[in-house]
Amino acid sequence: MLSGVCARLASALRGTRAPPSAVALRCLHASSSRPSADKRDRTEKPPRAFDQALLEFLVCPLSKKPLRYEASTNELINEELGIAYPIIDGIPNMIPQAARMTHQNKKQEEVEQH
């Protein structure tokens, strides 16, 4: 059973890797002089999107419950605890201290509506 899960995880991760040429270019780029901010902004690729296939394997580190992906805010949401983990460049930041509370926002909206 565990080997099947590991195989599916490995398969999902293989699909998210950058091509070797991009990695090689980054290494060469890092060893050369640093470009100006204007040039770097024009040549950088847009941030990578989150691969939703990983939701099968990711759980909240606090409750061990499945998470829901919210594309509009680019976060992984734990409805039960009312927290949202940010996703930066396609990588979820699952550190509990980095999560934001979502229940407080809902309570404030309810108070403002009444």
UniProtKB/Swiss-Prot annotation:
Residues 51-97 form the TRM112 domain. It is found in: Mitochondrion. It comes from the Eukaryota. InterPro entries: Trm112-like. Pfam families: Trm112p. Gene3D superfamilies: 2.20.25.10. GO terms for cellular component: mitochondrion. Residues 1-35 form a transit peptide. The keyword Transport does not apply. Keywords: Mitochondrion, Transit peptide. SUPFAM superfamilies: Trm112p-like. The keyword Kinase does not apply. HAMAP family: UPF0434 (MF_01187). Belongs to the PREY family. PIGY is derived from the same bicistronic transcript that encodes these 2 different proteins. This is Protein preY, mitochondrial. It comes from Bos taurus. The gene is PREY.
